[in-house]
């Protein structure tokens, strides 16, 4: 059963998951499917790496074949399990062995598990898609987790759409938690997005790929360099 027994006090949280504001946003490279891309992202300066465990994703990672190389990544880099409406059994499998530092969940059917997930001690990120420029996408006051990710919307997709939204909307969402900006970010536009949204972190998948699931290392390097170059 999923409960506080899954908690591991011995695992130190990477900086990405501490909630401390820096002079520039943290960077998360998402949808990583192989060790070469993970290592390159870290060498270029990524603070976190996301692994998509949703079978319906173009970036789906078969976890059983990836545990060894994921666990070998530097401990100061946040390893984030990304899921879409996962079952309790799936979440328990992901949390086994402290392979991941945090959970990032898309969809809504997992909401009833939020309090139990927080009790495990794993930081929880709720990912939502911005569909309407005139209102908050859903009521966020109830959410007990670590952070909220705002992503672009495309019907039928749960993330990694490459779609942007009005970045300045993030400044209106006062929820007392770190806000992560995602959706359509690229090396060419991430500085402008940061200046408008002032997020805690930026998240990118499509914008640094040569094809779904395969990262373009030059784009990753340029994206991270662009974020690092944002003036305080």
Regions found by a protein language model. Name each.
Residues 2-232:
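Conserved N-terminal beta1-alpha1 strand-loop-helix module at the mouth
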